[in-house]
């Protein structure tokens, strides 16, 4: 990870209460509406005044590569659930009521939860409460955006407070009303941890003057948009000032981002170049958004972080900041960026993903690094050289070919139309095709819940009844903190080649490179920069064993490859604990899931004979 400063490690901040207990940090997530990366002066934008946001960036961290969805509802669904839209997007203006949100999870951890601003995720009167929010002050909850031809969000807004309609008729300004409600919520809950989620109304069109505009009758859309961005900044400043007033500032993580790019009607200047807004587009103009994180005495100051951030990353980050475990029964695509902003050991993501479907149109998808971007159509762009994506690359360098292969592997993970290949090793939802190593039924220590195979207590290794030699095995895994497990293949008894499953950060074996996650255990080390997700999150894995060739894959990237008859193999084999085993690595045998005395989870185990 590249940073433009020297990091001084700081202790993880928290407030000590009079009782001696530790109060979990408060969490504020602010998401403006239609305000791209170029709209913040700290990012190099010069068209707008954003002093409060700039101060948060100066005294905290800002990211240069945060990517949203191209439109509001898709981004709201993704940020609240931590999942790609490919998994759970239903339609515009709707959040599937079966989904779990960060509000649900934080509420279970004792947080008071509040949402203010724009809803647009379902018109059921109980929607905010259903999705985990104790309190709400919202526009476009059960009512339409317009009433008798007039917009209802800005002057004299039509809102709903905790499900009750409230119309204002004395010149009140919608953004002021909802911001004041959030500030009041913080004051009422200052003695307990709270989550304040503020998907803003501003600066979405119609572009109208704000209470601070010089000309209250202005019809100049560009000027009015500029004033609306300034009012976004003012609302952020009001919230931060309230935290200061309450003495909560040092125990509150404040995050600011935006739901998508700027409106196409707006041109802005960024680093001396004019940028046309691109809301609804899959380009940077539609998806490159600001991200600022601030937490005094916990986040080092003046950080400029070039790591990638996906909108699915906010949920695990909030849970991480709350020191709360991620649920084991959810599929999450995000990973916490808290280590980056707090100056701790981090494992930056290698790519981000966007899935976008408008109405009944066919969905579009891409995966990207900071520089390169691959669409599901096969078009591959160097975004540094071609920001508007006019000229897809045709002739690739070896390095570009490698990046493209990684991005294709990532895309394949989210292809809803891709048929699962191979035989499901738990097709019956039980252990009928598995035994213990000594041939007994699997009766203790292992269980299956909602398709997840969970090693939860001592039960011993388990193996398939069928033996395999040449195959492709795909599976997902996650491990407990400081945990160890593995998937063995070409086995005899408990011996065999092993795809290592490990908490690389906390396990005592983490000083041995060939014992780290994804490695061919005790033989071939996975690279340090492998795309491993943190403890508690699902990693996708693949093992290919065909003849003498052995490959290990992790989250779409090949991390181990070796030929059993090669000089490299002979060298590492002689240094391993297996050196006395004749024909080791060439046996035909069962697939083995290891019981290494730690909780471990596996799912979607599918094998295809080669």
Describe the residue ranges of each PLM region.
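Short loop/turn segments that connect beta-strands within the blades of beta-propeller domains
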Residues: 376-377, 546
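Hydrophobic, well-ordered secondary-structure scaffolds
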Residues: 11, 27-30, 556
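A ubiquitous, low-specificity "background" feature that marks scattered single residues
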Residues: 8-9, 168, 211, 239, ...
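Conserved hydrophobic/aromatic positions in well-ordered beta-strands
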Residues: 54, 292, 379-381, 488, ...
């Amino acid at each position: 990870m590249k940073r433009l400063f020297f990091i001084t490690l700081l202790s993880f901040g928290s407030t000590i209460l009079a009782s001696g207990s530790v109060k979990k940090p408060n969490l504020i997530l602010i998401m403006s509406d239609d305000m791209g990366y170029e709209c913040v002066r700290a990012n190099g934008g010069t068209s707008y005044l954003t002093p409060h946001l700039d101060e948060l960036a100066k005294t905290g961290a800002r990211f240069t590569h945060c990517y949203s969805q191209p439109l509001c509802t898709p981004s709201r669904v993704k940020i609240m659930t931590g999942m790609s839209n490919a998994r759970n997007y239903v339609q515009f203006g709707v959040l599937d009521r079966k989904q779990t949100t960060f509000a649900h999870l934080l509420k279970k951890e004792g947080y008071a939860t509040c949402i203010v601003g724009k809803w647009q995720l379902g018109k059921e009167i109980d929607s905010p409460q259903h999705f985990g929010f104790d309190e709400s002050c919202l526009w476009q909850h059960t009512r339409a955006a317009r009433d008798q031809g007039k917009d209802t969000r800005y002057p004299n807004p039509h809102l709903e407070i905790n499900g009750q309609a409230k119309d204002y008729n004395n010149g009140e300004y919608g953004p002021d009303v909802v911001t004041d409600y959030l500030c009041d919520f913080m004051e009422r809950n200052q003695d307990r941890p709270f989550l304040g989620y503020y998907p803003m109304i501003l600066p979405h069109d119609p572009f109208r003057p704000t209470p601070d505009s010089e000309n209250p009758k202005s019809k100049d859309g560009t000027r009015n948009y500029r004033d609306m961005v300034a009012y976004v900044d003012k609302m952020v400043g009001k919230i931060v000032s309230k935290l200061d007033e309450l003495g909560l500032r040092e125990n509150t993580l404040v995050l600011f981002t935006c739901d998508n790019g700027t409106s196409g009607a707006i041109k802005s200047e960024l680093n001396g170049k004019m940028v046309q807004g691109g809301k609804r587009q899959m380009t940077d103009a539609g998806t490159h958004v600001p991200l600022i994180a601030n937490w005094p005495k916990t986040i080092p100051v003046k950080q400029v972080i070039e790591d990638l951030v996906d909108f699915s990353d906010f949920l695990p980050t909030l849970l991480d900041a709350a020191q709360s475990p991620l649920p084991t029964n959810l599929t999450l695509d995000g990973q916490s960026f808290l280590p980056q902003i707090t100056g701790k050991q981090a494992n930056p993501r290698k790519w981000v993903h966007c899935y976008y479907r408008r109405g009944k149109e066919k969905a579009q998808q891409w995966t990207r690094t900071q520089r390169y971007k691959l669409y599901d159509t096969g078009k591959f762009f160097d975004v540094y050289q071609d920001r508007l994506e006019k000229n897809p690359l045709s002739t690739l360098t070896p390095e570009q070919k490698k990046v493209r292969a990684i991005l294709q592997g990532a895309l394949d993970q989210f292809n809803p139309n891709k048929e699962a290949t191979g035989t499901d090793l738990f097709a019956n939802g039980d252990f009928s095709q598995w035994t213990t190593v000594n041939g007994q039924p699997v009766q203790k220590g292992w269980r299956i819940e909602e398709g997840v195979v969970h090693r939860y207590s001592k039960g011993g290794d388990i193996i398939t009844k069928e033996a395999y030699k040449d195959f492709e095995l795909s599976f997902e895994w996650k491990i407990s903190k400081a945990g160890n497990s593995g998937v063995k293949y070409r086995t005899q008894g408990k011996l065999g080649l092993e795809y290592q499953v490990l908490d690389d950060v906390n396990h005592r074996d983490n000083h041995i490179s060939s014992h780290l996650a994804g490695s061919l255990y005790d033989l071939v080390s996975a690279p340090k920069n492998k795309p491993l997700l943190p403890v508690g999150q699902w990693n996708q894995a693949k093992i290919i064993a065909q003849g003498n060739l052995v490959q290990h894959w992790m989250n779409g990237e090949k991390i181990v490859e070796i030929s059993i008859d090669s000089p490299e193999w002979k060298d590492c084999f002689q240094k391993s604990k297996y050196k006395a085993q004749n024909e080791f690595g060439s046996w035909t045998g069962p697939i083995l899931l290891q019981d290494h005395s730690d909780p471990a989870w596996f799912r979607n185990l599918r094998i295809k004979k080669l």
